[in-house]
Amino acid sequence: MFRIAICDDEEIFRKNIYEIIMKYMDENGCPCEVDEFASGKDFISLGINMAKYDIVFLDINMDEIDGLETAQEIRKVSNDIFIVFVTAFVNYAVQGYSVNAIRYILKNNENLTDLIFECIDAISKVMKHTVKKKEFKFNEGIKNVPLELLL
């Protein structure tokens, strides 16, 4: 199961990223937990509990504590968390990779959904999150169900 955090001070972008992630997970039969945070300060207030997340989608330009500072705090807790910067500012890309971000995605890109899908695919391969499925035949058609969802 993927545990994902979205940290963005703009609700419209948090919701958009959330919907894209859920679409990916639904299409790929991957169970997940997704939590949203309205600021870097809110996220790093979790302290050591930040380590429960596999992936953090992180905006860079936020009030109080920006995304780069948030990423630095994440790295103090864990080097295993995949950091994905999703931002409107291209000029921070080099700094973003200094905290070992796996991707730097521009929010206003018309291919945002495809880019996030590709990003999760890449992370999934690294994490080796292979979902075993069982095929069931119904009158309405065939449905593949992840085995971990079956009792």
Task: Give, region by region, the residue ranges found by the protein language model.
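Switch/coupling loops of ABC transporter nucleotide-binding domains
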Residues: 2, 32, 81
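Conserved acidic segment of CheY-like receiver
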Residues: 2-21, 56
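Conserved SAM-binding loop
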Residues: 6, 36, 85-86
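Short, well-ordered amphipathic alpha-helices
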Residues: 14-24, 43, 71, 120
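A generic structural motif
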Residues: 25-34
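Helix N-cap/capping motif at the beta->alpha junctions
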Residues: 36-45, 67
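CheY-like receiver
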Residues: 50-129
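Conserved binding/recognition cores within well-folded domains
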Residues: 117-151
